[in-house]
Regions:
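PRPP-associated nucleotide enzymes
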Residues: 1-159
Length: 159
């Protein structure tokens, strides 16, 4: 799935020279690193990866003071690809977009997710999807990654 996402990113962006991958903490970061690695293998250039802490920008968690986000040099000419493990309501993505916007004005922002499980509360649609996995509201998708959990696995758990 990640190899296909990497090829789709290359095709849509005519290469990967002006890309920045922004992994949503926690599991989006290793996914972004894996995609960057695949892009580097294909294109001979590995785009940079940053980690996004979206906690202060969430509207569904207790209010936290939003940190001063560092300006990212060259962001103005870049396409930022936000990478996350699971897309559900869209609230994490909205927070990630706000976090990226605080770092500067990207040329474009795109979204890559490993799993799209539906049930959106916001009008957000990913540009790149590893797997569409329709679920019931009372189910939860758990993504386990080698880097964070010691194994690669996706499971659906009833709540």
């Amino acid at each position: 799935a990640l190899t296909r996402i990497a090829f789709e990113i290359i095709e849509k962006n005519h290469g990967c020279r002006n890309l920045l991958l922004a992994g949503v903490h926690t599991r989006g970061v290793p996914l972004a690193e894996r995609i960057a690695q695949k892009l580097g293998e294909v294109e001979g250039f590995r785009p940079p990866v940053i980690a996004l802490d979206i906690g202060p920008f969430r509207d569904d968690l207790p209010h936290q003071e939003a940190p001063v986000m560092p300006d990212i040099p060259g962001l103005a000419g870049c396409t930022v690809v936000i990478v996350d493990d699971v897309l559900y309501t869209g609230r994490s993505v909205r927070a990630a977009i706000e976090a990226v916007s605080r770092m500067g004005r990207a040329a474009r922002i795109q979204l890559a997710v490993l799993i799209d499980r539906g049930h959106r509360e916001l009008p957000i649609r990913p540009d790149y999807v590893g797997k569409n996995l329709p679920t019931a509201q009372n189910e939860r998708v758990q993504v386990h990654l080698r880097e964070t959990d010691g194994r690669d696995q996706v499971t659906i758990v009833k709540q």
